[in-house]
């Protein structure tokens, strides 16, 4: 099937690792009334249509929503709604698919949208993806601003450590605030956050070309070799300006 898309969504469709992880999860978990939030081109709704009784694809951008409507027009059990999921009036849902992911859930609306949508999920309902694991590692950089490091161009100064797991089926926090201890093999002046997505039990997807690029957060001070404790906080869905990190 050939999809009509914008250039950006064409890149999303070309990220085969991302699509495979979601397709496998959807094939084993989607059922009943399924919502696809932030549906984009409609590809995940297309996957879900084979397994769910009814799929409602919600997309707030009118241009890509029109594309999704055209892409899914031949499927009798799929409807496309051009509306913001933060304001949509849901019916009781059996499955919620929401791929508004970003590294550590900082710069996309995955958490704000799900916090509202979960109020309408049945007690035995399912969320795809299931969870995200966030990890950090020390790195050395020659810049001062937060930036993505898609190609892992900055060498690591120590091992990666998982510092948080966010489960999407339950009470979602808006803010992460905590400390993490990193082991550095050499002095460092930044941390790199890497997120891994659990789309369903046993299906884990790391950063892909179009999902969760590693994020580098420079520090004002330089950390010494050995164990260093970092204070880290951010608002999920609050954007990169909400990030604060410092050496304790």
Swiss-Prot record:
Taxonomic superkingdom: Archaea
GO molecular function: histone methyltransferase activity; protein-arginine N-methyltransferase activity
Gene3D superfamilies: Vaccinia Virus protein VP39
A Pfam family recorded for this sequence: Methyltransf_25
SUPFAM superfamilies: S-adenosyl-L-methionine-dependent methyltransferases
InterPro entries, alphabetized: Arg_MeTrfase, Methyltransf_25, SAM-dependent_MTases_sf, UCP006607_RNA_methylase-rel
UniProt-listed CDD domains: AdoMet_MTases (cd02440)
UniProt similarity note: To M.jannaschii MJ1452.
Entry protein name: Uncharacterized protein MTH_738
């Amino acid at each position: 099937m050939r999809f009509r898309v914008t250039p950006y969504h064409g890149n999303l469709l070309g990220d085969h690792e991302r699509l495979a992880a979601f397709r496998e999860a959807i094939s084993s978990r989607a059922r009943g009334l399924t919502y696809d939030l932030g549906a984009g081109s409609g590809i995940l709704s297309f996957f879900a249509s084979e397994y769910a009784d009814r799929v409602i694809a919600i997309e707030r951008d009118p241009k890509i929503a029109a594309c999704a409507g055209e892409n899914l027009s031949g499927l009798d059990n799929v409807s496309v709604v051009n509306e913001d999921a933060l304001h949509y009036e849901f019916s009781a849902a059996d499955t919620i698919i929401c791929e508004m992911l970003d590294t550590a859930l900082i710069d996309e609306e995955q958490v704000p949208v799900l916090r509202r949508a979960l109020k309408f999920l049945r007690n035995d309902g399912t969320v795809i993806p299931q969870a995200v694991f966030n990890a950090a590692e020390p790195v050395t950089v020659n810049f001062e601003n937060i930036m993505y490091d898609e190609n892992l161009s900055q060498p690591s100064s120590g091992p990666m450590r998982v510092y948080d797991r966010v489960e999407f089926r339950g009470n979602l926090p808006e803010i992460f605030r905590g400390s993490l201890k990193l082991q550095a093999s050499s002095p460092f002046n930044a941390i790199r956050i890497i997120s891994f997505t659990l789309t369903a039990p046993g299906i884990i997807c790391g950063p892909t070309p179009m999902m969760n690029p590693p994020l580098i957060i420079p520090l004002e001070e330089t950390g010494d070799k050995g164990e260093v404790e970092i204070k880290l906080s951010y608002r999920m869905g609050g954007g990169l300006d909400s990030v604060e990190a410092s050496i304790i």
